[in-house]
A protein has these predicted regions:
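Short amphipathic alpha-helical segments
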Residues: 36, 76-77, 136-138
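Internal hydrophobic alpha-helix adjacent to the cofactor/substrate pocket in enzyme cavities
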Residues: 51-74, 101-102, 160-161
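Solvent-exposed alpha-helices and their adjacent loops that cap or buttress functional pockets
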Residues: 31-32, 36, 72-73, 119-121
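Hydrophobic pocket-lining residues within nucleotide cofactor-binding pockets
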Residues: 17, 43, 76, 110, ...
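Flexible, glycine-rich terminal cap/loop adjacent to redox cofactors
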Residues: 65, 82-92, 97-184
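Small-molecule pocket liners
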Residues: 22, 77-78, 127
Length: 184
């Protein structure tokens, strides 16, 4: 079950392209060990999500064109398109515990948002924000509609290392469900 990169039978060994784990080894510009071969998408083995592949391809194209750009896997959103939706970006509590890292968790019910209540009759949900010792946002996990539309905002905070105070200086439109991030 699941997906995995298929690197066999591609003839990569003929080009001396290195394999790392289950995928093709690439650098931050998506360049393989061969100076003229780039890789993006599932074949890299990092994140088997279409939106990651789009970004990896963009980074590769930028590098080919001489435009400075680097791939970062720090804040790739993952979404489960169910009802209610689930969305996640950044680190998880389990990951942090396993690595012995200290962190804080702030949980707030999605029903704190009047817009969420109006659009999700009898709906429940949760926003969980994870911060490090310096109060930097390092993870966000959402349960409730429209989590898939909100998670990108949290991803920007994770990717850029915003503290909670820096993040809260952003003005969120009212009434929106995304305000839940501001309230967390």
């Amino acid at each position: 079950m699941g997906r995995r990169p298929i690197t066999k039978s591609l003839g990569l060994e003929n080009l001396a392209i290195e394999i790392q784990g289950a995928g093709v080894k690439v650098n931050e510009h998506m360049l393989t060990s061969h100076p003229h071969v780039y890789a993006a998408g599932d074949i890299t083995g990092f994140s088997l999500l279409a939106h990651t592949a789009y970004r990896e391809a963009e980074v590769a194209i930028h590098h080919i064109l001489g435009i400075p750009d680097e791939m970062s896997y720090k804040a790739i959103p993952a979404v489960v398109y169910t009802n209610p939706e689930l969305a996640s970006v950044g680190k998880t509590e389990e990951e942090l515990i396993a690595n012995g890292e200290s962190f804080r968790v702030q949980k707030i019910p999605m029903t704190y948002s009047g817009r969420f209540v109006a659009e999700n009759e009898n709906g429940n949900g949760l926003c969980k924000l994870i911060t490090d010792d310096e109060d930097r946002i390092i993870g966000c996990h959402l349960l409730g509609n429209p989590a898939s539309e909100i998670i990108v905002t949290a991803g920007i905070a994770v990717e850029n290392g915003y503290t909670v105070d820096e993040f809260k200086k952003n003005i969120f439109p009212h009434p929106t469900v995304s305000e839940i991030l501001h309230e967390s």
